[in-house]
């Protein structure tokens, strides 16, 4: 009966999409001619400090400052609509961050962090780009996702109910296509970062980050570096390093949206 119910639900969704095809085509055309919507998500905030560096640097402060710098660079040329999930020292629950991206019909969601992770005796170091996956790519990714997913608990926020099995199946179908765009952007971003800043070994990793679970918005989580490493902390508070990092991320975003922006005034060239 469960299988029949899932099949029936899928059929209804397919019929609904087909009935709405002309409207969907119109909306798709309108969106193609609109400015891409980018949501930048500075991690943590408010009561949730995030990581604290060996020299006392607060993750919640450094990622907010960097997000504002990246926003300003992306604003040049007027190519995008850019939103921050927070622009001050405010705590935003993980589910609400995801919902912000969905409500804004974002074309790209970038969560920005600078965590503290220790693997045995080796301190993680270097920028890392994470995408969503059901199974973590490695122990570090698993540890980091578990830490990030505790954010709401730290702030005393009640965890949201998990979706029903049927709903989860249907959402997973939608996530698969979105995930391919997320991976494509992650690879594009790493391609730009590798000539600008130090990257961790195997810089594209994946795990079950709650903040990346929007089924309809390509999403990545960028670790600028690791505050548990004194060398990374020094870079993270360096204005010159932040400029290089933001410039590389800006170019990656331009590359990602270049096909859509081709021919428009102010569009970036190859």
Give residue ranges: language-model regions:
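Catalytic-core regions of hydrolytic enzymes
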Residues: 3-166, 175-187, 243, 247, ...
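Active-site-adjacent mobile loop/cap segments within catalytic or ligand-binding domains
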Residues: 118, 170-270
């Amino acid at each position: 009966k469960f299988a029949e119910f899932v099949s029936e639900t899928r059929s209804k969704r397919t019929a609904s999409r087909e009935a709405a095809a002309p409207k969907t085509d119109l909306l798709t055309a309108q969106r193609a001619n609109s400015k891409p919507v980018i949501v930048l998500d500075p991690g943590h905030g408010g009561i949730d400090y995030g990581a604290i560096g060996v020299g006392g640097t607060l993750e919640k402060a450094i990622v907010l400052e960097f997000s504002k710098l990246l926003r300003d660079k992306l604003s040049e040329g007027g190519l995008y609509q850019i939103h921050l999930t927070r622009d001050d020292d405010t705590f935003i629950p993980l589910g609400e961050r995801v919902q912000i991206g969905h409500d804004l019909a974002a074309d790209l969601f970038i969560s920005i962090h600078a965590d503290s992770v220790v693997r045995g005796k080796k301190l993680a170091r270097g920028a890392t780009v994470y995408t969503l996956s059901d199974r973590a790519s490695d122990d570090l990714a698993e540890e980091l996702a578990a830490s990030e997913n505790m954010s709401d608990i730290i702030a005393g926020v009640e965890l949201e109910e998990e979706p029903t099995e049927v709903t989860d199946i249907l959402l997973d179908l939608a996530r698969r296509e979105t995930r391919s765009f997320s991976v494509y952007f992650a690879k594009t971003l790493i391609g730009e970062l590798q000539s600008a800043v130090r990257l961790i070994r195997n810089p594209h990793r994946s795990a079950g980050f709650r903040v990346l679970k929007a089924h309809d918005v390509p999403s990545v989580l960028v670790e600028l570096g690791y505050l548990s490493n004194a060398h990374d902390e020094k870079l993270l508070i360096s204005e010159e390093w932040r400029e290089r990092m933001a410039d590389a991320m800006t170019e990656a975003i331009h590359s990602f949206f270049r096909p859509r922006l081709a021919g428009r005034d102010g569009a970036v060239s190859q």
